[in-house]
Curated annotation (Swiss-Prot):
Taxonomic source organism: Mycobacterium tuberculosis (strain ATCC 25618 / H37Rv)
Name this polypeptide is given: Trehalose-6-phosphate synthase
InterPro entries according to UniProt: Glyco_trans_20
Residues the entry annotates as binding D-glucose 6-phosphate: R28, Y108, D162, R342
Keywords linked to the UniProt accession: Glycosyltransferase, Transferase
Amino acid sequence: MAPSGGQEAQICDSETFGDSDFVVVANRLPVDLERLPDGSTTWKRSPGGLVTALEPVLRRRRGAWVGWPGVNDDGAEPDLHVLDGPIIQDELELHPVRLSTTDIAQYYEGFSNATLWPLYHDVIVKPLYHREWWDRYVDVNQRFAEAASRAAAHGATVWVQDYQLQLVPKMLRMLRPDLTIGFFLHIPFPPVELFMQMPWRTEIIQGLLGADLVGFHLPGGAQNFLILSRRLVGTDTSRGTVGVRSRFGAAVLGSRTIRVGAFPISVDSGALDHAARDRNIRRRAREIRTELGNPRKILLGVDRLDYTKGIDVRLKAFSELLAEGRVKRDDTVVVQLATPSRERVESYQTLRNDIERQVGHINGEYGEVGHPVVHYLHRPAPRDELIAFFVASDVMLVTPLRDGMNLVAKEYVACRSDLGGALVLSEFTGAAAELRHAYLVNPHDLEGVKDGIEEALNQTEEAGRRRMRSLRRQVLAHDVDRWAQSFLDALAGAHPRGQG
């Protein structure tokens, strides 16, 4: 079990600091501790865009990463002593935060993913509010703050990531006023009237105001935060509009000025572009088309299995296009890759059952023996296999009901150096603000989604190349390194030491 808060606070109040000038604080470490069949443990690299985005910055700046190592720690397994202190893994300094089964159930599956996640995604599923979940969220956030405090050198920069850790900035500010603290939210920040439903709304805003810079994907999220800061905490806030990577908002709290900005995250587009040109990837893409029966058109969906992603919307649209004869069943297929997600949360279990029932219905109605019209895989795909699917597909379907950014859309574009393919993209993704030459659709308008898919399937080669060239220009110019650098530059200017 993790030490009590009192013990850790004593450590943090001492005059000893860590030696890391730059600290990332995230729910997960960039590696997971895995138990092997013989009972021993090993570290395995975590997939994910956050690791890709921040690892180069960590390496350049003598960085450390604070996060959960991916195993539940209930104090019964003595071989988890490896988690007792900092770990050097592939030349990165890692500081594990130990979480018990109860912590995961209440802080992560409970408050983070059954309260905050649905609230921040426009209440597609009703948020659940439980006092014990909130209490655990506070407790775990305190442990993350204390771990960050121990890792950070005097005057270091600490970058806190995402909705699971919204109380950490204030907690860390109280422990270590010498630090420069940034926070970035990777999911949408909700409209004011929705956020006001939250019983602990003031505490969340106060937690975020502990940062020197609070970042969102879009200007709208930044504006909502400024309004709530003024209404709930009484900050004196700027009244002008917030721009993208410019025209920052400000909230004045006592003697401190908190900068608020919009920083749309991106992907490592150069690396994806390079990988997609690889001869082996190209060969695998051709094999995929052969394995699918060499259809004329392949539509692709790649998502975590989440109710925000609109998987059911695209399947229903495809089913109706088949029924209406606007798409031919013998030359068009859908491939849906659905990565398992939060499988112990009831709403996710229900979603999986619903999607698999929907796939079965479509294949039963329109497929043939040995030739389904929907190919559905409920498992993660290795990176190279995923890139091959991007290269092989003719239309990428990205239809979330709400999404902070959606990096899959940008990954697809980065992989299409051949200027082939088409992107059908929900207006309710952050990416839609940048990828204006996609086929933009409203996922709540089924007829509009059907029209968008049909238009993408039937585009001329010239029109498709023109659209994809424009999309690639945007994605290749605004990559993940530019995102991280723009945030950190703004953070350096936000702290009093950088103002002068």
